[in-house]
């Protein structure tokens, strides 16, 4: 059994203005060192510090697509077996109990209809992929949801659907399931400045999040998507800080 963590690197050991916040990094390194079947790859949107480069495999990419782009790009550069268990996680996650690893693996093994597991419940949304997407409300560019998808995945975005969704902060799956949906779709251009002076992190991220939620629901069905808790951004295993990357 092979376990692969894919960590979206942005905050590293500095969080909320405080440096040397290494609890997440230290725990992940300990897991890697103590388990021969567990590997960790950091997919970074800015140059990682030595605490990452000296302990983990990593790749650095331009910050396009936020966490969804980071996950997709690094998977394209890796050669993973179909049966590899995948754990996608942002480095601002507060982990209370690492036993979620075995909980997810046991659930996949006992419930073959389950294809992806998120942390806390996330909001469903009725989406018509041929209508204007969330990001386009801000940009006024008129793009529909399907316009943001990869060319090879556009055929999946055809009809109105109530989609369930997974936040990019954390979700687990298997490599064969991610290949089944053609990897991850995401807004494929950099963050821009919005009229109020902020950047487009939220509309970019929300559009990418629900693009993938639509696709997961379309291919796997709602029965294929599970959560570790029924609370938004929280389970007994993890709390999502929601800061983005």
Q: Which residue stretches match the model-derived regions?
A:
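Conserved catalytic core of nucleotide-sugar-dependent glycosyltransferases
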Residues: 94-218, 227
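Short, well-formed alpha-helical segments that are part of the catalytic scaffolds
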Residues: 12-32
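Hydrophobic/aromatic residues located in beta-strands of well-ordered beta-sheets
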Residues: 39-40, 86, 116
């Amino acid at each position: 059994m092979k376990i692969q963590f894919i960590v979206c690197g942005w905050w590293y050991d500095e969080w909320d203005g405080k440096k040397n916040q290494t609890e997440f990094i230290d725990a992940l390194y300990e897991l890697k060192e103590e388990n021969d079947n567990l590997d960790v790859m950091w997919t970074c949107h800015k140059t990682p510090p030595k605490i990452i480069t000296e302990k983990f495999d990593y790749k650095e990419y331009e910050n396009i697509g936020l966490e969804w782009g980071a996950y997709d790009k690094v998977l394209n550069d890796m050669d993973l077996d179909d049966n590899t268990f995948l754990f996608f996680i942002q480095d601002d996650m507060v982990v209370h109990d690492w036993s979620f690893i075995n909980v997810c693996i046991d659930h996949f093994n006992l419930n073959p209809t389950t294809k992806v597991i998120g942390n806390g419940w996330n909001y469903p949304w009725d989406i018509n992929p041929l209508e204007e997407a969330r990001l386009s409300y801000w940009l006024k560019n008129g793009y529909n949801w399907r316009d943001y998808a990869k060319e090879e995945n556009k055929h999946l975005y055809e009809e109105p659907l109530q989609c369930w969704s997974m936040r990019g902060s954390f979700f687990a799956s298997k490599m064969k399931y991610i290949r089944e949906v053609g990897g991850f779709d995401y807004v494929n251009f950099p963050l821009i400045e919005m009229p109020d002076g902020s950047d487009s992190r939220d509309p970019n991220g929300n559009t990418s999040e629900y693009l993938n939620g639509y696709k997961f629901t379309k291919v796997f069905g709602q029965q294929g998507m599970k959560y570790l808790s029924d609370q938004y951004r929280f389970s007994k295993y993890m709390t999502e800080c929601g800061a983005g990357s």
